[in-house]
């Protein structure tokens, strides 16, 4: 039986922040405009540069801390503490693009995993090794009585409808990876960097990006609520792509 890390909510909540963005709006009861900070509709627990040292310390210490706590469940216990004390619809854990100790901990803490991937062969090759790790995490979680969906789906990003190679690579993913792929793709845009530089969301300054993310959220909710229907839907998509491709070849 694994040891459990007990977190103090009073300590944890001090690291949770509600981010804001600067906008202009008409002052109440006045014709004058003023600059105000408006809160986003979510909270964050931001990372920091010293976090990069944590993974190094974890690797040097092995699978356990000095106190004997198993690292694999550390973020799981942290998330459990947040769930018990705060009312969030969803908790999203963003991880670095590397299968290190922190990413493994985050995978254990997640009820389901979304795999973002650029549209290039090297990124696709990494999906298979990642899937093997995700399958191991899922089996380990179930052995501890923890509900875990494994990989929910692959999300293609930096997508451009103007590049025929992107369409070909999308078809490649559907054909050669048994893992479901979201129909939504996050399109490539310079606005993403502009939003990041100005402390804004990509969707705030790009209407097409907002439509992409709205559609993605709908897909994720559907996949979480009805797994069998989700898998059937993604399979039907591949069958449609395959039929269209065969039709083009015959012509």
Roles of regions detected by a PLM:
Residues 1-251:
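P-loop NTP-binding core
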């Amino acid at each position: 039986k694994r040891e459990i890390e007990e977190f103090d909510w009073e300590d944890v909540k001090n690291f949770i922040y509600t981010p804001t963005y600067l906008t202009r709006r008409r002052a109440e009861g006045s014709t004058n405009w003023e600059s105000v900070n408006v809160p986003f509709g979510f909270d964050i627990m931001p990372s920091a540069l010293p976090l990069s040292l944590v993974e190094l310390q974890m690797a040097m210490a092995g699978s356990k801390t000095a106190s004997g706590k198993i690292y694999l469940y550390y973020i799981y216990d942290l998330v459990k503490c947040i769930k018990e004390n705060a009312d969030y619809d969803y908790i999203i854990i963003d991880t670095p693009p590397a299968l290190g100790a922190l990413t493994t901990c985050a995978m254990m803490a997640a009820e389901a995993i979304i795999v973002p991937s650029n549209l290039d062969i090297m990124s696709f090759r990494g999906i298979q090794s990642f899937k093997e790790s995700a399958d191991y995490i899922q089996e380990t979680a179930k052995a501890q009585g923890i509900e875990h969906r494994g990989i929910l789906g692959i999300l293609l990003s930096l997508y451009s409808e103007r590049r025929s190679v992107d369409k070909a690579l999308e078809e490649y993913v559907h054909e050669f990876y048994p893992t479901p792929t979201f129909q939504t793709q996050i399109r490539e845009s310079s606005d993403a960097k502009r939003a990041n530089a100005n402390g804004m969301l990509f969707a705030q300054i790009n209407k097409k990006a907002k439509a992409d993310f709205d559609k993605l959220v709908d897909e994720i909710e559907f996949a979480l609520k009805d797994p069998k229907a989700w898998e059937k839907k993604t399979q039907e998509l591949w069958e449609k792509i395959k039929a269209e491709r065969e039709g083009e070849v015959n012509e």
